[in-house]
Amino acid sequence: MKKTARLAIVLFALVLVFTLSFTAFADGEEAADVAEAAAEEPSPVTGTIIAYIGAALCAILAGIGSAYGVMIGGKASAGVASENPDLFGKLLVLQALPGTQGIYGFLVAVLVLVMFPAGGDVTEGLRFFVASMPMGIVGLISGICQGKAAVAAIHMTGKQPDASGKGITMTALVETYAILALLASILLIVL
């Protein structure tokens, strides 16, 4: 739990530093320097680049969480299935549950790419960047946590095969927070 909390704090700090650095870049320079730089060459930082970085981070972070969750579920499933191969179907469902966060992160990334206006400015890019972060960060953490819940449910199913439905329910409860983050990101993008 402490490792996940530390990871969340580090990710939040990175997102905050990234966002503030772009805000400072867009607003904090002296007017003469900005006018002089604009006359010489265009800024390498555009709204499109910022939005696309947010989309990429969302898909990457949620994908990492899902990959890790499915991986630890797979390791536990392999151990249980080696002793009781008849449980493979039930174990596969439990192992696959943490994979949904990666799908949600990909969905938000595609939504950012489709909804970002052509020629959007830095402020619009930051808005889309920030809008993609709830799903990216929560997808990472909830994918890992759902994988841990799936491991416990897999072990429970190995000992009591009739309890797999209860294990699915317990594992699916973690999904609630990924769905809330998905909704938050979608609302921040479209509104």
Segments from the language model and where they lie:
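Hydrophobic, small-residue-rich transmembrane alpha-helices and their short perimembrane loops
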Residues: K3-V15, T19-L191
